[in-house]
Amino acid sequence: MTGTMDSASEYVNKWLIKANNDLKVAENEIKLPQEDMVTEAICFHSQQAVEKFLKAYLITKNVEFGKTHNLEFLLELCSKQDKDFGKIDVGNLSFYSVEVRYPNEFHIPSGDEAKSCIGIARRVKEVVLKKLEIGKSELNI
């Protein structure tokens, strides 16, 4: 993805930038003192990062995924393209896409849960960028 990018690669690049920005929000929040940390925000933004990284990969493979926040489904679609995605465990990260944002499913994740969510997001980022043969400097991320 060097040189002049066509509209398809620009679109993928935008997904990757959005994904990375979500990860940055989570990483910045987790650096705060425990009493100031908003762990549900960390988990939510980690989930969003994973979702967007996986969708960016699927777009490059012309795989339709519809409107979904289900990481297991997206990961399954990715695994059909490349078996290495089958080695990724997203745990219960899909829970944080919607449920954690509303009081009817009230749950405050622990600091350890938040760290785990960021770890998953970092792993997915690493795999997606490797598969797309994109260096961090190419995206300024």
Give names to the regions the model predicted:
Residues M1-I141:
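Terminal alpha-helical segments
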